[in-house]
Amino acid sequence: MSETKRVRVRYAPSPTGFLHIGNARTALFNYLFARHNDGDFIIRIEDTDAKRNIADGEESQMTNLKWLGMDWDEGVDVPGKYGPYRQSERQSIYEPLIQELLDKDLAYKCYCTEEELDAEREKQKANGEMPRYSGKCRHLTKEQQAEKEAQGFKPSIRFKVPANETITFNDMVKDDVSFESNGIGDFVIAKKDGIPTYNFAVAVDDHLMEISHVLRGDDHISNTPKQILIYNAFGWEPPIFGHMTLIVNESRRKLSKRDGSIIQFIEQYRDLGYLPEALFNFIAMLGWSPEGEEEIFSKEEFIKMFDPKRLSKSPALFDNVKLTWVNNQYVKKLPLNDVVELSLPHLQKAGVVSAELNQAELDWVHKLVSLYHEQMSYGAEIVPLSEMFFADAESITFDEEETAVLAEETVPTVISAFKKELEALEVLEAAEVKAAIKRVQKETGVKGKGLFMPIRIVTTGEMHGPELPLAIEVLGREKVLNRLDTWLKNN
């Protein structure tokens, strides 16, 4: 392909499911490559497998790509001169090209039933052979074909794979890759209903849409020789291919939609209150890295830096700890009002704050969220982080370490004195709480951890957490006194 040819890349999802983290990465790398080269980024919907398509699959793809911060130059919602951009609307384009291959004797009609093909595959497996079509229908005469059709058999169309050829291409990630044609077998390019198969439709669409580079997952690499053969059959120049390594989990296994340890879909991250800029940043580093040690970049910086030569040849590790860290870096930079906006729906969904808040209640939520602003990684995390603020005194339990602290003989004296100090305060404010703790220290002679730790454990139910006077202010006078009183009655 000429190096001066305009860069045109595509993300071509099938609407058979929602936007998955792996597909999002494919889209994102294509987007960055297009924008870096002042080229075109195209969204094409590959929806020819009608049985597997789901109602909201296409919408999920588009909505969540936009949410992540991507836009495109052509697609089902951005008309261009290379449309239609749904494969289901391109049947009239495919049919004459399939006929052209038949006319050139580069394809043939196959009347084999699924049962026959299954039996053939099983026999090959039993013999230790690689399953591939035997070519049974390749040499049928016109008369034999007519006889099959008279018997009611509908043909699929198979591509005639040339024998004894080596198909080689230079991959942007893997360098030179070769396949032997003898290992491929004649493959179907149109099903019995006339609908083209994936490999045929993709090759045709990529050519007619003038796609210059095909950047996709490693799981597609076995499709590439078939697509190159189709290009060669029509005398077309193939695009430049690049196959990204797969994403793996912490066990180094391919990321699977059945893997419950990792959230798989962009919509789920969105619903949990992750920031799109943070997720964009994290995904962009899955199998690609810039020079240097820095890991936080803006979209504009990624566009400026992106070079497919820096795509990793090793599988990309999906690191949940890194994901949390990256999101936290972005949350920390947000103004408090934005973090409250991110958190509030989750507090309401959990039922710990009302759906309709007055100003005093909203002010309280601001105070609550401010305690965890530096710690939070995503909106929904506010619920487990702040659960101590909503627990009843009777439901608070202490672990072994906390129980050991509360077993010290000075603890009842400290708790009793602190309760007395708070009862004298009409309003609990952090400064007043701090002063009250100092007075307890003076009165009891207990200081340091022996003073602060029992007060923290009894009032918050936790050994560690936000600054104690602030936490007590947010808890409120009634709740704190109730917890102190409950502990004293039980000990």
From Swiss-Prot:
A motif ('HIGH' region) lies at residues 13-23. Zn(2+) binds at C110, C112, C137, H139. Its cofactor is Zn(2+). One of its GO terms (biological process) is glutamyl-tRNA aminoacylation. It catalyses: tRNA(Glu) + L-glutamate + ATP = L-glutamyl-tRNA(Glu) + AMP + diphosphate. Keywords: Aminoacyl-tRNA synthetase, ATP-binding, Cytoplasm, Ligase, Metal-binding, Nucleotide-binding, Protein biosynthesis, Zinc. GO terms for molecular function: ATP binding; glutamate-tRNA ligase activity; tRNA binding; zinc ion binding. SUPFAM superfamilies: An anticodon-binding domain of class I aminoacyl-tRNA synthetases, Nucleotidylyl transferase. Binds 1 zinc ion per subunit. GO terms for cellular component: cytosol. ATP binds at K257. The keyword Ligase applies. Its EC number is 6.1.1.17. It comes from the Bacteria. It is found in: Cytoplasm. A motif ('KMSKS' region) lies at residues 254-258. NCBIfam families: gltX_bact. Monomer. Catalyzes the attachment of glutamate to tRNA(Glu) in a two-step reaction: glutamate is first activated by ATP to form Glu-AMP and then transferred to the acceptor end of tRNA(Glu). Belongs to the class-I aminoacyl-tRNA synthetase family. Glutamate--tRNA ligase type 1 subfamily. This is Glutamate--tRNA ligase. It comes from Listeria monocytogenes serovar 1/2a (strain ATCC BAA-679 / EGD-e).
